[in-house]
Amino acid sequence: LDHVLKTGSPDLRTRMLQEVAGLFLEDAHRLGARHVEVFDDILIRLTESVELRTLTTLSRSLADLHLVPRELARRLANHDDADVAAPILRRCECIPESDLIDIAWMRAEGHLGAIAGRKAVSQELTDILLMRGDSSVLRVLASNPGADMTSAGLAMMVDAAERDEGM
């Protein structure tokens, strides 16, 4: 692994990432926590030197798994590029609420829209999205039956809807 990371071409690093990710995806359902940690370490190192489209593909392939390498999922969810982050933010149920809250406070609309589209969105997250999101984020949130709203959040949504005919 060290040799490939230091001297391997970008294509070789990408192929190695794809192969290791493929092994993980193939066996994820029967791996124990320690094995997942090993995959996490290896995959993180491999993702540090590959193209965005490879990271986006990896994010899409991991998003629906019940057991995802924790640090890798965290890094993908918080990636600068919303296309990389969105599959994990929208569909991965393994991302802790605290991470989602941090991301909702720090990131822009692409990330916020993905969080707004989750199957379940807590009241705290909903309030953050209502405070920080643009109209496209609020539309996603308004159409999400899994978004739990406080009374203050509902009032913010009504105010936003009065200003936005599309909502």
Role assignments for model-derived ranges:
Residues L1-M167:
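Alpha-helical scaffold segments
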